[in-house]
Amino acid sequence: MISVTELRNGTKVQMDGGLWECLDYSHLKMGRGGAKVVTKFRNMESGSIVDRTFNSTEKLQDIYVEGKKMQYLYPDGDDYVFMDMETFDQVHLGKNIVSDAAKFMKENTEVEVAMYGDKALSISLPNQVILKITQTDPGVRGDTVSGGTKPATLETGAVVQVPLFVEQGTDVKVDTRTGQYLSRA
C-alpha cells in the first residue's frame, strides 16, 4: 500500500478495479481541515483520464510493472506485431496500447513494453530515433542562415518541423517524447 501523499508522476496504482498511472498531483492544505491531494490519473487499459481528490490519509494499492525489451516487426491490420527479445515469441499489441508511439516506429525498432503479469499496458520508445525524410519542400538558396523551418514527412508518416537546409532523403534524429527535430544523423 502507498499513501496518496507519496504519489509522483508515473506512479502506477490499482484502484476501482483497474490499473492507473498518475499523470499529475498536487497537495492542497485546507485552512481548518486536513490536507487534500488532487490527482490526475490515466487508465492504463482504456486510456481514459480522470481527476480524483483524496484525503491525505488515504492509501492506494501500488503495482509492480515489469519492462520487457521487444522489437517492432510489422503492422498487422489494427495491431502491431512485436518480438520478445528473450523468448523470441511474437506478440500482437493493439492501437490503444501503442498509441502515439506508432508514428516514430519503423521495422526493427527496439522498444520497452510495460507488462503487468501477462498483460501489456504501454510501450516506451528510445528517447531519440533516426528516420529518413521521404518528402519535404526544397530549401531556397540563402535560407540556411535565416533559421526558419519547414514541414518534413518521415518514413513512418510522421510530420516534423526541420531547418530549411535539410533535404529529402536525409537521415534525421528526432526526439520521440516531443516529436522535434534534433539534428542530422
Swiss-Prot record:
<dbReference type="InterPro" id="IPR014722">
    <property type="entry name" value="Rib_uL2_dom2"/>
</dbReference>
<comment type="similarity">
    <text>Belongs to the elongation factor P family.</text>
</comment>
<keyword id="KW-0963">Cytoplasm</keyword>
<dbReference type="GO" id="GO:0043043">
    <property type="term" value="P:peptide biosynthetic process"/>
</dbReference>
<dbReference type="InterPro" id="IPR008991">
    <property type="entry name" value="Translation_prot_SH3-like_sf"/>
</dbReference>
<dbReference type="InterPro" id="IPR013185">
    <property type="entry name" value="Transl_elong_KOW-like"/>
</dbReference>
<dbReference type="GO" id="GO:0003746">
    <property type="term" value="F:translation elongation factor activity"/>
</dbReference>
<dbReference type="InterPro" id="IPR013852">
    <property type="entry name" value="Transl_elong_P/YeiP_CS"/>
</dbReference>
<dbReference type="InterPro" id="IPR011768">
    <property type="entry name" value="Transl_elongation_fac_P"/>
</dbReference>
<dbReference type="InterPro" id="IPR001059">
    <property type="entry name" value="Transl_elong_P/YeiP_cen"/>
</dbReference>
<comment type="function">
    <text>Involved in peptide bond synthesis. Stimulates efficient translation and peptide-bond synthesis on native or reconstituted 70S ribosomes in vitro. Probably functions indirectly by altering the affinity of the ribosome for aminoacyl-tRNA, thus increasing their reactivity as acceptors for peptidyl transferase.</text>
</comment>
<comment type="pathway">
    <text>Protein biosynthesis; polypeptide chain elongation.</text>
</comment>
<dbReference type="Pfam" id="PF08207">
    <property type="entry name" value="EFP_N"/>
</dbReference>
<dbReference type="InterPro" id="IPR020599">
    <property type="entry name" value="Transl_elong_fac_P/YeiP"/>
</dbReference>
<dbReference type="Pfam" id="PF01132">
    <property type="entry name" value="EFP"/>
</dbReference>
<dbReference type="InterPro" id="IPR015365">
    <property type="entry name" value="Elong-fact-P_C"/>
</dbReference>
<keyword id="KW-0648">Protein biosynthesis</keyword>
<dbReference type="GO" id="GO:0005737">
    <property type="term" value="C:cytoplasm"/>
</dbReference>
<keyword id="KW-0251">Elongation factor</keyword>
<dbReference type="Pfam" id="PF09285">
    <property type="entry name" value="Elong-fact-P_C"/>
</dbReference>
<dbReference type="InterPro" id="IPR012340">
    <property type="entry name" value="NA-bd_OB-fold"/>
</dbReference>
<protein>
    <recommendedName>
        <fullName>Elongation factor P</fullName>
    </recommendedName>
</protein>
